[in-house]
């Protein structure tokens, strides 16, 4: 009877170890994708817009020293499945860049009842000029993969 409990305990321990290792692998994979997207965006020199998708950049000064920046992705009724997006800027920071669908589950906007879009938002110290770049990937209603790049040059007054 004691022998059976030991085997059960070993199975439980092996299961916990497997879950832990799978979780670490997933985080490592997400980090790799995130870094690849950052590198891709750093190399982008011009926009490649997705037809029917509207992207709006906004910057609000929240204090004398900090701004809140965000990109609003409006799907305009289009089907957007498995959305992945990353918003970067050209300033040095210790913070990670806002993203969706990379570290968390992909978002899909399919039905009319779904939200009209996605918002990526972050905070940054005030600078005279900041260049923001957005990478947007998704699958459309015909299951065609789309990849788009948007650029916004912010001028502080």
Predicted regions and their residues:
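Positively charged n-region of N-terminal signal peptides that target proteins for export
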Residues: 1-12
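C-terminal motif of bacterial Sec signal peptides marking the signal peptidase cleavage site
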Residues: 20-23
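Bacterial signal peptide processing site
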Residues: 25-27
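N-terminal low-complexity, Pro/Thr/Ser-rich intrinsically disordered segments
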Residues: 30-50
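Short, surface-exposed binding/anchoring microloops in extracellular/periplasmic proteins
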Residues: 45-88
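Beta-strand elements of well-folded, non-transmembrane domains
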Residues: 59-61, 73-77, 89-91, 122-124, ...
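Short, solvent-exposed, Trp/other aromatic-anchored flexible loops in extracytoplasmic proteins
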Residues: 94-148
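Short, low-complexity, Pro/Ser/Thr/Gly-rich segments in the mature regions of secreted, periplasmic
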Residues: 146-157
């Amino acid at each position: 009877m004691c022998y059976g409990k030991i085997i059960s305990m070993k199975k439980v321990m092996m299961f916990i170890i497997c879950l832990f290792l799978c979780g670490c692998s997933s985080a490592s994979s997400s980090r790799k994708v995130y870094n690849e997207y950052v590198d891709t965006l750093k190399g982008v020199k011009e926009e490649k817009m997705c037809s029917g998708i509207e992207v709006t950049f906004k910057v609000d000064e929240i204090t004398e020293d900090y701004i809140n920046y965000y990109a609003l992705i409006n799907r305009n009724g289009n089907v957007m499945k498995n959305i992945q997006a990353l918003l970067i800027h050209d300033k040095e920071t210790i913070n990670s860049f806002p993203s969706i669908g990379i570290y968390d589950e992909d978002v899909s906007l399919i039905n009319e009842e779904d939200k009209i879009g996605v918002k990526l938002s972050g905070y940054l110290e005030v600078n005279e000029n900041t260049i923001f770049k957005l990478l947007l990937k998704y699958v459309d209603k015909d299951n065609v993969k789309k990849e788009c790049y948007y650029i916004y040059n912010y001028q502080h007054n």
